[in-house]
Amino acid sequence: MKVLVTGFDPFGGESINPAYEAVKMLPDEIAGAQIIKREIPTSFTRGTAEVVRQIELCQPDLVLNVGQAGGAAGLRVERVAINLADARIPDNDGAQPVDEPLVPGGAAAYFATLPVKAMVRGVQAKGYPCQLSYTAGTYVCNAVMYTVLHTVQSDPHIRAGFVHVPYAASQLEGKAAGTPAMPLADITAALAAAIEAVVQNKTDLKEQMGRLD
């Protein structure tokens, strides 16, 4: 089994992106699966194109894209991606689409095809904070998640999803007091736990993780 795991390059004035910093520290094998690690640009155009190119090149069984969610207290396993780009800040190419579809005429949304609840429980079982999320935002993270799910929708052999990670502790300088973060080693270990859960669970858990907000 091959797992393609991607992380973004730095954006928004940050010197690092904990997504790729953690991804590149992952072991080359998790639960018997080969881990293929790639960096992709934080760009609506180039990021989506690169992840599709990597899928074509690597022919993975599983795709897990990883992005930074500054302000998150732990990992967020994303359940849904929407066909909308509404960028609060420009991407790394200076593009700032507002209220634009990612794929004109495409589905309004796609659900992750990974066992998202099993991933949450797998990370929590290792002692790391993690929750199920029902919005991947409207920036490049959502764009990549949507594009991947749109690309693999006709191939049931490939399952895909997205995880957001918090700031690394090394990014806290200059940020407001109380801004949550995790040590980079912990982010990496939590990602490994999420991947292990994906490899070991072809179907998801049947338990309540809904929200009222």
Q: PLM features: residue spans?
A:
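Short conserved micro-motifs at the rims of enzyme active sites and ligand-binding pockets
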Residues: 172-175
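Hydrophobic, aromatic-enriched interface-forming segments
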Residues: 140-149
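N-terminal catalytic or cofactor-binding beta/alpha core of small enzyme domains
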Residues: 1-136, 149-157, 177-213
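Glycine-rich phosphate/pyrophosphate-binding loops
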Residues: 160
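An accessory alpha-helical subdomain
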Residues: 164-170
